[in-house]
Amino acid sequence: MKKMVNIGFIKMGNLGMSQVINLIQDEIAAREGITVRVFGTGAKMAPADAADTESFKQWNADFVVIISPNAAAPGPTAAREIWKDVPCIIVSDGPTKKEAREAFEQEGFGYIILPVDPLIGAKREFLDSVEMASFNADAMKVLSICGVVRLIQEELDKVTEQVASGKSGKDLELPHIFAKPEKCVEHAGFANPYAKSKALAALHMAEKVAQVNFPACFMLKEIEQVCLTAAAGHEIMGAAAQLANQAREIEKSNDTVSRMPHAKNGAVLKKVRLYEKPE
């Protein structure tokens, strides 16, 4: 009999992927063999917020996923220090430099770095709650349709299966993935090459958003420059979401949408035609 697997998610701040990462292994709430709990610090991700995650250790997770923007920032760094004695996977939009990622691996952490999870235009002059939610909805369209959700789901399932089979602690093989657009789109299961090309374009656009929004968030001072630049970044994200939708519509029109639901026992099933059963 396989072990019940406790999977903990620590959400510090917010990425696009933060919205669903704790749901993607049990999409219809019918999977047996796993229990999921989430500790969130809201929009903030300071060292003081990281310190509060210590109490989550009482739940005794078999492995933990820490998701946050910029894993090299002080808050996420403090969280890693707290959780270094538990198998831990870092999910973040950075650092993107190879040396920094290798340092995570040397310290025993798994990681999935997502340069395609875009930086929001987080300036009071531009961003309110409605704009924030709209941007995240656009980001989720790209992350879901274009392969990012499935990539992460597959990697978390691999670690879950190891725990269920009796592995634990340092014996677990954790992912070490830099998820560039070309890698992500290969997980989306597109049958039509034009659909795949639209999805790849959407991922490249999502990656570009951070390059546009970074100056608006951290460098520009004049209100016109800040607002124009942040608005441009959000327009790129909206256009990327439209391309992602177009890609899925092509697959739907050909009845070739790739679906990979979980069986009750956690096995991943597959189907393509709308009216066929997943097997």
From Swiss-Prot:
The UniProt record lists the keyword Transferase: no
Keywords, in A-Z order: Methanogenesis, One-carbon metabolism, Oxidoreductase
Cross-referenced InterPro entries: MTD (IPR002844), MTD_sf (IPR036080)
Any GO BP: methanogenesis, from carbon dioxide
A Pfam cross-reference name: MTD
GO molecular function, one term: methylenetetrahydromethanopterin dehydrogenase activity
Keyword set includes Transcription: no
Pathway: One-carbon metabolism; methanogenesis from CO(2); 5,10-methylene-5,6,7,8-tetrahydromethanopterin from 5,10-methenyl-5,6,7,8-tetrahydromethanopterin (coenzyme F420 route): step 1/1
Catalytic activity: 5,10-methylenetetrahydromethanopterin + oxidized coenzyme F420-(gamma-L-Glu)(n) + 2 H(+) = 5,10-methenyl-5,6,7,8-tetrahydromethanopterin + reduced coenzyme F420-(gamma-L-Glu)(n)
Gene3D superfamilies, per database record: 6.10.140.120, F420-dependent methylenetetrahydromethanopterin dehydrogenase (MTD)
E.C. no: 1.5.98.1
Summary of the function given for this chain in its UniProt record: Catalyzes the reversible reduction of methenyl-H(4)MPT(+) to methylene-H(4)MPT.
Family according to the record: Belongs to the MTD family.
Protein's recorded name: F420-dependent methylenetetrahydromethanopterin dehydrogenase
Gene this protein is translated from: mtd
